[in-house]
Curated annotation (Swiss-Prot):
InterPro entries in alphabetical order: OPRT, Or_phspho_trans_dom, PRibTrfase_dom, PRTase-like
Function: Catalyzes the transfer of a ribosyl phosphate group from 5-phosphoribose 1-diphosphate to orotate, leading to the formation of orotidine monophosphate (OMP).
Family: Belongs to the purine/pyrimidine phosphoribosyltransferase family. PyrE subfamily.
Cofactor(s) demanded: Mg(2+)
The protein's Enzyme Commission number: 2.4.2.10
One example of a Gene Ontology biological process annotation: pyrimidine nucleobase biosynthetic process
Gene name of the record: pyrE
Sorted UniProt keywords: Glycosyltransferase, Magnesium, Pyrimidine biosynthesis, Transferase
Binding annotation for orotate: T137
Subunit structure: Homodimer.
Pathway field: Pyrimidine metabolism; UMP biosynthesis via de novo pathway; UMP from orotate: step 1/2
Top-level taxon of origin: Bacteria
Record organism: Agrobacterium fabrum (strain C58 / ATCC 33970) (Agrobacterium tumefaciens (strain C58))
Keyword Transferase: yes
Protein name, as recorded: Orotate phosphoribosyltransferase
């Protein structure tokens, strides 16, 4: 296992936000909002998958993730790391390597042939599993994987997202009700703070983004999107 520096969480949040701006993973556009699969309209979009193509930034982010898990959850709390199909799979491999743990991955649905498996890899019954995703919006996709792992006999008390939206009360309730502690590196508020400090956009654009972060669903509805999040 690697040796990690347990950097202060606020410093990590700022550094990771800067990394995301550097690799152009973040997009702001208040004039032509993005439409998500949920039907929500948003002036912000982030592509966390880009991290896998930038080895130095990827390595630093995964070191931060490993340190966050050990600092906030403990050193001997897990038996394996699970990645969610598909974006979480490479990050599960990177994190498992750093934590010295086995890795599994979880499909969104059973594959429908062969063993009809939804969990790939070896997961002993009662294994304590850390679930990782590249990003979490309101927790719905992560709980798809958590529920499948629990149904297969695994124990899931913790999840980690490299990026957490951090703007939906529904997400806080979902994780609390699901008895899962969510760990994360950075949020939209951190990304916006870096953009403002480094003057990456004019104040009109930044204020438009901030208006969305303050009231995301009303903003979405006003711009032709959904006014509530899907329940699943």
């Amino acid at each position: 296992m690697n040796h990690f520096t347990f950097t202060d969480r606020t410093v990590v949040a700022e550094l990771v936000a800067k990394m995301l701006w550097e690799i152009k993973a973040v997009h702001f556009n208040s004039e032509s909002p993005y439409t998500f699969a949920s039907g929500m309209k948003s002036p912000v979009y982030i592509d966390m998958r880009k991290l896998i193509s930038f080895p130095r930034i990827r390595s630093a982010a995964m070191d931060f993730a490993a340190a966050a898990v050990m600092r906030e959850a403990g050193f001997e709390k897990f038996d394996c790391v699970a990645g969610g199909e598909t974006a979480g799979i490479p990050f599960a491999a990177f994190l498992a390597e750093r934590l010295g743990l086995p890795m599994i991955y979880c499909r969104k649905k059973p594959k429908g042939h062969g063993r009809n498996a939804q969990i790939e890899g070896h997961m002993p019954d009662g294994a304590r599993v850390l679930v990782i995703e590249d990003l979490t919006t309101a927790g719905g996709s992560m709980f798809t994987f958590i529920d499948a792992i629990r149904a297969a006999g695994g124990i899931v008390d913790h999840g980690i997202a490299l990026f957490y939206y951090g703007i939906f009360e529904e997400a806080e309730a979902r994780f609390a009700n699901g008895n899962v502690k969510l760990h994360y590196l950075t949020t939209w508020r951190d990304v916006l703070a870096v953009a403002r400090a480094e003057k990456l956009f004019d104040e009109k654009t930044l204020s438009g983004v901030e208006a969305f972060l303050d009231n995301p669903l009303p903003w979405s509805a006003k711009h032709g999107g959904v006014s509530e999040l899907p329940q699943s």
